[in-house]
Swiss-Prot record:
It comes from Mus musculus. This is Sentrin-specific protease 3. It is found in: Nucleus, Nucleolus; Nucleus, Nucleoplasm; Cytoplasm. Pfam families: Peptidase_C48 (PF02902), SENP3_5_N (PF19722). The lineage of its organism: Eukaryota, Metazoa, Chordata, Craniata, Vertebrata. The modification Phosphoserine is found at residues 52, 71, 73, 163, 175, 182, 206, 226.
Amino acid sequence: MKETIQGTGSWGPEPPGPGTTYSNPRRERLRWPLPPKPRLKSGGGFGPDPGSGTTVPTRRLPAPRPSFDASASEEEEEEEEEDEEEVAAWRLPPRWGQLGASQRSRALRPSHRKTCSQRRRRAMRAFQMLLYSKSTSLTFHWKLWGRHRGRRRNLAHPKNHLSPQEGGATPQVPSPCCRFDSPRGLPPPRLGLLGALMAEDGMRGSPPVPSGPPMEEDGLRWTPKSPLDPDSGLLSCTLPNGFGGLSGPEGERSLAPPDASILISNVCSIGDHVAQELFQSSDLGIAEEADRTGEKAGQHSPLREEHVTCVQSILDEFLQTYGSLIPLSTDEVVEKLEDIFQQEFSTPSRKSLVLQLIQSYQRMPGNAMVRGFRVSYKRHVLTMDDLGTLYGQNWLNDQVMNMYGDLVMDTVPEKVHFFNSFFYDKLRTKGYDGVKRWTKNVDIFNKELLLIPIHLEVHWSLISVDVRRRTITYFDSQRTLNRRCPKHIAKYLQAEAVKKDRLDFHQGWKGYFKMNVARQNNDSDCGAFVLQYCKHLALSQPFSFTQQDMPKLRRQIYKELCHCKLTV
């Protein structure tokens, strides 16, 4: 509630009313007397004369509008209207309308100095907006026009200020089910690969592709014509950044397109012949593109929706088979697409698009790996943590090494025997007594090849024993000379020959170091090299792999472990 100063000097004569007395003119809150009860009408065809117990509802006449001084300016009259509306919004008692018009206008009208200062401030604010505002020409006039409340009234609905009984528009009441906060519903369903790509484009803020047909707004139709057509309105419209365009033939300014939110930083003009060459050349390029054969254009065009759907189905099947996309390569997906659609997908553009699809699929929630995925083979159980060691440049663990060694041994069981990766560590620490029961069911001297993985601290190496030739060969991808390992294996073979009564194998063992093998160039691929040594020795294949083949060989090892079978 607004506080004023009670007194004769400010408010004029006191309003008439019984029992209305004010003490000394001090600053206090307004205390209005109770309004007198209106007299009821009777007679004139309105029914019987009401008595003491009869109440007839009547309509209260609106208070007369106050008269304004002839000397008041037009702006002061608008300010007085705004002040009266503000006072009406304060819900003052009805006796406020019974005061004299001159008293209310004198009480509400600000001083001459205050009016001048307000006008000066508004003029300076409008001038600053004109100089420094970055808004367009359309929005500037809207801001300047919106200073006056009477001009902001919607002209399309002139009866909005009337009540519904007087013929005005019915107020828009929100539905009881309407809520003004964003509802928290169920989480959105899992998007497919195509939906994820569209969502990523929306997150990047890529602008939508214009559709080109004519545009309609507020009943006016703006149809884009040829760029060189002077009647199209494009050369005579008002530019969105405030620059005026060329006028029409009759001096009238044409309408601007509905999308006036684009700011043009540089405006230049070109000759008609240059513009014609530009647009004609583009039209010729489009015609030449359309003249291409459908088969050739289809082979080199970007991926279509059915291609994206096929890629997603391939990735889904791959994820269920291998638990992750670690052993997947782009070439493999491209080959499957070529087999299905009988088209060329190995072009650089299409191949890069396939790679982007794979990366987008991996970023989707739940597609990194299948939780709970396991591979069981005999006594071996591989989890995703074990299989994850084959990704990138991770170090292989004992579980992967031992299961792959068993796969090698089971591929040629009569020829090869593979020792567990913990065998050498137990032999080195506890001697023959610690490992003498490891081969109680196997006569190793009936085999052709013995494979013994060696794990020293953080490095993998391999010892291969040719039983017939009685040779012990040490394979190391870092080409280190470790003489202790062959000696420990030679002592074990002698002790095993004595225990198994194979005295012909007690003597004649020789040790070698294999130096002309593929060498690793990092600190993480030693385990993958050892597995390839085992496979190629067991299958009697030459060492044709190098360091550059390790990413592909890691993916191949992953698949062989999941299928529990070597790729021969």
